[in-house]
Amino acid sequence: MIQVLLVTLCLAVFPYQGSSIILESGNVNDYEVVYPRKVTALPKGAIQPKNPCCDAATCKLTPGSQCAEGLCCDQCKFIKAGKICRRARGDNPDYRCTGQSGDCPRKHFYA
């Protein structure tokens, strides 16, 4: 049961991109023991679809993509400059997309 939990957590965090996932099913609810280099069945919902912005074989952006993830990335393109990506909290201002990156600017801490 612990092995199933670990494999399920791993698959939920790291999308299935190729044949490197290691799992073989016996007959117990499609979960079973981990065996090297063979995939026969996976729990429903354990595999996330691959990111269309990334080429899994090269680990690079697909042609025409500007970004693959981030609060300022939408459908593989940078979000326009000025869009709020993180609301103000306390004394910190709203953080806005720059239009040059898929990442929301980092929080600034003042002494």
Curated annotation (Swiss-Prot):
GO biological process, one term: cell adhesion
Intracellular or extracellular location(s): Secreted
TM segment ranges: none
One Pfam entry name: Disintegrin
Chain's role: Inhibits fibrinogen interaction with platelets. Acts by binding to alpha-IIb/beta-3 (ITGA2B/ITGB3) on the platelet surface and inhibits ADP-induced platelet aggregation in human platelet-rich plasma.
Native source species: Agkistrodon contortrix contortrix
Cellular component terms (Gene Ontology): extracellular region; plasma membrane
Tissues in which the UniProt entry reports expression: Expressed by the venom gland.
Subunit structure: Heterodimer with subunit beta; disulfide-linked.
Gene3D superfamilies (alphabetical): Disintegrin domain
Motif (Cell attachment site): 89-91
Keyword Amino-acid biosynthesis in annotation: no
SUPFAM superfamilies from the UniProt entry: Blood coagulation inhibitor (disintegrin)
Record-annotated Disintegrin domain positions: 47-111
Paired cysteines (S-S): C53-C76, C67-C73, C72-C97, C85-C104
Signal peptide: 1-20
Record-listed Pyrrolidone carboxylic acid modification sites: Q48
UniProt keywords, alphabetically: Cell adhesion impairing toxin, Disulfide bond, Hemostasis impairing toxin, Platelet aggregation inhibiting toxin, Pyrrolidone carboxylic acid, Secreted, Signal, Toxin
Residue ranges the record assigns to the propeptide: 21-46, 110-111
One GO molecular-function entry: toxin activity
Principal subcellular localization: secreted
Name of the protein this chain belongs to: Disintegrin acostatin-alpha
Family: Belongs to the disintegrin family. Dimeric disintegrin subfamily.
Domain of life: Eukaryota
